Amino acid sequence: MALTRLLIKDFRNIESADLALAAGFNFLVGPNGSGKTSVLEAVYTLGHGRAFRSLQAGRVIRHECAEFVLHGRVDANEREASVGLSKSRQGDTKVRIDGTDGHKVAELAQMLPMQLITPEGFTLLNGGPKFRRAFLDWGCFHNEPGFFTAWSNLKRLLKQRNAALRQVSRYTQIRAWDQEIIPLAERISEWRAAYSDAIAADISATCALFLPEFALSFSFQRGWDKESDYGELLERQFERDRALTYTAVGPHKADFRIRADGTPVEDLLSRGQLKLLMCALRLAQGEFLTRQSGRRCLYLLDDFASELDTGRRRLLAERLKATQAQVFVSAVSAEQVADMVGEKGKMFRVEHGKIEVQPQD
């Protein structure tokens, strides 16, 4: 799985770019503010329908332009496909696959599985539970065909239930929502638990390479007491939920906790160690997908050198090479990525939104 070509139009500070990409490493080098992160973000947006630095389309469309357009050629298991995405300032989104309109962003996500590592990615470890739920849900989305529909339906029903809690006085008035919510909640929790169990060995092995000095443990918390029946719990907690005006327990409150030597990692590890752990989690998840489905992730690394010393950068470079996946790396200078440069790599110089291929010695 690799992008062989990327066309960018009116995205961030990039007016127009047409990039022939390497199947291995693609380095984006340039000073801060040059647009190298914008290239990473264009790749990410092509596979997610949204940018990773802003959820508002208007903020990623180039100044005074009506829309951005992204187009890519994908080499997927000896089959080439074309994918395209455009979004207007009004939020209108168009997805094209192999020249036909009417496709969903979820189809792009299936075609282009990606792992993103950014300086802001520490939220996976020290942010709220929603970031760790997203980690599990990425895996469930790519491993369970029914997950996306089930999770979308559950979110819709929970939103309706929360709105109803502001208007009802008796539990019987919202029982109809709960009868739909309960089987979805149980199924989603089963998928998450199964995925966290399945990937645990991969995470442990990768973390042992990156952080051998710590004994790491992982636990999935489904969002309600494991000894309780979810339906009975919703009924018992009705008065509390009504006072709060939201549903306080369920899969939307799940978490995936990580401890080092029995202590939450965010309380014990340095920033450099947290970044290594974040990288280990992303790599383990990508490699697990490859082993399960034969598909390789695209890895996107923004500001590669931040928080990592030379030895840790070299270790990460070796692990990324071992995946044989396509990798996009941004850095201020070529020296920061010297350990990653190889025959299958390509270097791009980015300045003021202009992108040029650089010859490699």
Curated annotation (Swiss-Prot):
The keyword Amino-acid biosynthesis does not apply. GO terms for molecular function: ATP binding; single-stranded DNA binding. InterPro entries: DNA-binding_RecF, DNA-binding_RecF_CS, P-loop_NTPase, RecF/RecN/SMC_N, RecF_2. The keyword tRNA processing does not apply. ATP binds at G30, P31, N32, G33, S34, G35, K36, T37. GO terms for cellular component: cytoplasm. One of its GO terms (biological process) is double-strand break repair. It holds the Pfam family SMC_N. Keywords: ATP-binding, Cytoplasm, DNA damage, DNA repair, DNA replication, DNA-binding, Nucleotide-binding, SOS response. It comes from the Bacteria. It is found in: Cytoplasm. NCBIfam families: recf. The RecF protein is involved in DNA metabolism; it is required for DNA replication and normal SOS inducibility. RecF binds preferentially to single-stranded, linear DNA. It also seems to bind ATP. Belongs to the RecF family. This is DNA replication and repair protein RecF. It comes from Yersinia pseudotuberculosis serotype O:1b (strain IP 31758).
